[in-house]
Structures are given as structure tokens and as C-alpha cells.
């Protein structure tokens, strides 16, 4: 299946897997989705991820994280900000704080994909891909 917006597709798959309390979610692998998965792992939103397959059939297997006996998802919500029809950019001074610092914004900068905190620290702006909390 051809997907135009791989970031939105990734966020939707993670959101649906969280609601269904799935342990693992499969996402098509691109440079951006790999880097976003790495940021999610570094920030503690997912356990781990692994790349499977070769060539055009490459995909990521992302292991989701849950808390407690009731298996509450660590990821409460995901929101796509910059869309193909309306790109949203910000310089390092304008980068948003998600829920007063409780969540993260994933930013695509000239130095790669990173969190809003890292981009602010490095003095970088870029495209605001999504908010996660």
C-alpha cells in the first residue's frame, strides 16, 4: 500500500496499537520513521524497535510500553502538526513546549530529527512534525 504521509501513518498505527493494547506495532521504514522511533526510544515512550525485511519491504517493529497492572499506555496522545498541505516551521526561539515540558515535540532540523529540548539547546529550528505526551 502506498502512503503519502509516512509520519501520520506511523502516528496512527501507534495510536491504534496503544488503544488495542498491542505489544508490538509494524510501521513502514523510512529515514524519518526510523529517526522518530529512535527519539521515542531515547525519551522512554517505547521499549525498543527493530528493522525487518529488505529493500522496498522494509518495516520497523516497535515494542510499545505500558505501565502498571492495568497496562496504561505510556503514550497518552500523539498529534500531527506539520502536514503535507500545511507545513509548520519554527526557529529555536519559537519552538513550543508541549504540556509545559511534560510532552515532547519532534522536530526535523538540518542536523536530523530530534526533540524540542535538544533543538532548543543546540539553537536549531525546523519543521515541527508532531507532539507526543
Swiss-Prot record:
Pfam families: Ribosomal_S8
Localization of this protein: Plastid, Chloroplast
Keywords for this protein: Chloroplast, Plastid, Ribonucleoprotein, Ribosomal protein, RNA-binding, rRNA-binding
An annotated GO cellular component: chloroplast
Main location, first listed in the record: plastid
PROSITE patterns: RIBOSOMAL_S8
One Gene Ontology MF term: structural constituent of ribosome
Domain of life: Eukaryota
InterPro entries: Ribosomal_uS8 (IPR000630), Ribosomal_uS8_CS (IPR047863), Ribosomal_uS8_sf (IPR035987)
SUPFAM superfamilies found in the cross-reference section: Ribosomal protein S8 (SSF56047)
Example GO BP: translation
Subunit structure, interactors included: Part of the 30S ribosomal subunit.
Similarity comment: family membership: Belongs to the universal ribosomal protein uS8 family.
NCBIfam families (UniProt xref): PRK00136.1
UniProt function note: One of the primary rRNA binding proteins, it binds directly to 16S rRNA central domain where it helps coordinate assembly of the platform of the 30S subunit.
Protein name: Small ribosomal subunit protein uS8c
Organism of provenance: Porphyra purpurea
Lineage: Eukaryota, Rhodophyta, Bangiophyceae, Bangiales, Bangiaceae
Gene label: rps8
Amino acid at each position: 500500500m502506498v502512503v503519502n504521509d509516512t509520519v501520520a501513518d506511523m502516528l496512527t498505527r501507534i495510536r491504534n496499537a496503544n488503544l488495542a493494547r498491542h505489544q508490538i506495532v509494524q510501521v513502514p521504514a523510512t529515514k524519518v520513521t526510523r529517526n522518530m522511533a529512535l527519539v521515542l526510544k531515547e525519551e522512554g515512550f517505547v521499549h525498543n524497535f527493530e528493522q525487518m525485511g529488505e529493500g522496498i519491504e522494509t518495516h520497523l517493529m516497535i515494542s510499545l510500553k505500558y505501565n502498571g497492572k492495568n497496562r496504561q499506555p505510556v503514550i497518552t496522545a500523539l498529534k500531527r502538526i506539520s502536514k503535507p498541505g500545511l507545513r509548520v516551521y519554527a526557529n529555536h526561539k519559537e519552538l513550543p513546549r508541549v504540556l509545559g515540558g511534560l510532552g515532547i515535540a519532534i522536530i526535523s532540523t538540518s542536523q536530523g530529527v530530534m526533540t524540542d529540548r535538544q533543538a532548543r539547546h543546540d539553537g536549531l529550528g525546523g519543521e515541527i512534525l508532531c507532539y507526543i505526551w
